[in-house]
């Protein structure tokens, strides 16, 4: 899980979602693409 100021999709399987007011990226193909804005 990377904590970044600016979250971006790394691959086409990455999805940008908002959970409890926090912007996150989840990825089905590569778990290393997970990010959180903070």
Curated annotation (Swiss-Prot):
Domain of life: Bacteria
A single MF term (Gene Ontology): structural constituent of ribosome
Alphabetical UniProt keywords: Ribonucleoprotein, Ribosomal protein
Gene Ontology BP annotations: translation
InterPro entries: Ribosomal_bL36 (IPR000473), Ribosomal_bL36_sp (IPR035977)
Keyword Signal appears in the UniProt entry: no
GO cellular component annotations of the record: cytoplasm; ribonucleoprotein complex; ribosome
A Pfam family that the UniProt record links to this protein: Ribosomal_L36
Record family assignment: Belongs to the bacterial ribosomal protein bL36 family.
Record protein name field: Large ribosomal subunit protein bL36
């Amino acid at each position: 899980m990377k904590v970044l100021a600016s979250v971006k999709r790394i691959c086409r399987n990455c999805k940008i979602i908002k959970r409890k007011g926090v912007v996150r990226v989840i990825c089905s193909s590569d778990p290393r693409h997970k990010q959180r804005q903070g």
